[in-house]
Amino acid sequence: MYNGVYETDKKVFTGEKFNGKDVKNTLKSDIIKYFTSQGNFVLEKNAEIKDEKTTLKGDQLEYNKNTEIAKSPKAFEIKYDDYDIFGSSGTLDKKTNHLTGNNVLIKSKLNEEFKGDRVDGTLDNMNLDFIGNVSGRIYQDGVPVNFKGDFVRAYFKKDTQGKNQIQRVEIRKNAVIEKEGTTLYSDYLEIQPEKKLVFGKDNTKAVLKDKDGTITTVTSNMMTGNLNTEIVDLVGKVVVVRKDKDKTLNATSTKAKIKNKDNMIELRGNVVVDDGESVITSDEADYNTKTNKLKARGNVFVDYKVNEKKSVTNANQINSGYNKILKK
């Protein structure tokens, strides 16, 4: 250190090119102010506080050696494990590695990303809450999964090498998940990347785009799905709307299964299908989105919109079901 001056009346030590160490933290900066009676360091320009796990950098850092709490009133950067953390201001408890910060962006070496207006959580287990204008990106089998919402809670676990690995992401309020041709909306969405699962409840909606560009929109009370297989199970007040360039199909049911890659929509319970030409009610129905073929089973009733009505109720017809090619 150079140009050190101690002001006895103020109990303040100032200097340049500081490099020092307490029990477990190394501190350095171009300019230092040390308030001896309080144990407070003010590090300015190229400031750094480092221990075995964490490196905190900023243009201005404040550190209390008694509490081991570091504060950054200005922009900061933290390097922890495989993660780089950036923020406009924040506080890091060096004893517990608890971080609170504003306008935070977290990036991993795997190109995963989380950002939000605020963050609150512990770095050691990487269980973090992101609050306000949250967005991020994780990967499933190398394919990006993007998400956003008002609030996100991220859970990590240690892998066999002791590295933190994303285990679960909860997204609340205005939640959106996007992967390739699938977009999910809800008040609550949850991703489990390791199991390749997604779960949604409360005002759920799935929008699926097939290879031909046709859009299928599905709403329900609850949904579970696999983003890799693009199979989505829906329960409660299911509504399906499928639009192509020529027509729209509307369907409702109690439950449904969307098999997007197999071009199949399976409707179960109190099924009603309106293809524009007729309204078909049944206990079950399978709709092939590629062939436009609908197969209905169990208590089938067809109401043609040209006022021709046909009830399909005898035993043979119920067993064989009802088949119709839905014209484009």
Question: What residue ranges belong to the model's regions?
Answer:
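Mature-chain termini and adjacent capping regions
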Residues: M1-K328
